[in-house]
Amino acid sequence: MWRGIVCGLLAGAFWGAVFIVPVLLPDFSPLELMVGRYICYGVLAAALMLPRLLPLLRRLRRDDCLAMLRQALSGNVVYYLLLAYGVKLAGVAATSLIIGLLPLSVTIFGRKDHGALPLRRLALPLLVVAMGIACINLDIFSHAGGAGTDGASLAQKLLGVLCAVCALACWTWYALDNARFLKCHAQVSAVEWAMLYGLASGVIALIVGAVVLALQQAGAADAVPTRSWSQFWLVCLLLALGASVVGNYLWNLASRLVPVTLSGQLILSETLFALLYGFLYAQRMPRPLEWGAMVLLAAGVLWSVHAHAREESAGGEELA
């Protein structure tokens, strides 16, 4: 089990890096970052699947292709675009803490699929989470600056928080849709499917990138600042390789080696690493309200996971 825990923590370390990239490349818009990341991911996915790509594509039906496109949009393209805007406007800490609610949001909205606890049994964990969200919002709007905010105005910070919430909703929907799809389509493995919608994400990013490039060339009369495109593509390639390929592979290993209830807790490592990277970049310690938000949100999510673990254990004893 310890091997699985290490794999889960390493996956979180790779995934946490996605939150710091908008801060590392401030001269590039979230749209450009999304395009760069998923073009690189699409190329890597195609290269990794090359020997079996054509046979796999022939097995896909029209419904499979539609599912692949909608999951590429919800789980990759739109999700990361919203995340990057959240980081730019509200900062790394706020965005990572809000998206760190994923284990709880997937549990709540997927309760009919998994026979999870009724909401009334989750009232106290949800209250703790709400207190954590209140803390991080109080911190955002009472302090100027921070990793990723670039002196954002009140309206921009509000928009950043909204983007983070929408990113959370987007990935929650994707996670549930993906799980339901894989249960009903055993002919495609989880790894093959991840690579397929990675390839679809690359195609979408390529189309969006072509449109953005055409618009930029049409407005070429405006002065465009010199930007380090070599650094941009290097970071995007490392992000695609680390977060999208290696991170996902490590998480698949962890999922096989640890109990399901523990995997929900390991997802929090993504948030913790994102916070660590953000505070290291800003060269500061968390403020009191940020400490409070981290403790409350982690406690709320872990409380919920523990409640479900007890319910599963009780159900298993009854069946025995």
Where are each of the predicted segments found?
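Helix-helix packing/entry segments at the starts of transmembrane helices
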Residues: G12, G36, N76, Y80, ...
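Hydrophobic/aromatic residues within transmembrane alpha-helices
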Residues: L25, L33, G86, K112-L117, ...
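C-terminal transmembrane-helix exit sites in multi-pass transporters
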Residues: L48-R52, L102-L127, A134, L272-W291
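Glycine-/small-residue-enriched transmembrane alpha-helix faces in small-molecule transporters
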Residues: M1-V35, A144-L182, E318-A320
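Hydrophobic transmembrane alpha-helices of multi-pass small-molecule transport proteins
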Residues: A45, M49, P118-H143, A147-G148, ...
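Hydrophobic alpha-helical transmembrane segments of multi-pass integral membrane proteins
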Residues: G4-V6, E32-L48, R70, L124-M131, ...
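C-terminal-most transmembrane helix of multi-pass membrane proteins
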Residues: Y38, L138, G264, L268-A320
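Specific transmembrane alpha-helical segments of multi-pass solute transporters/efflux pumps
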Residues: A17-V18, L50-I99, C135, A240-V258
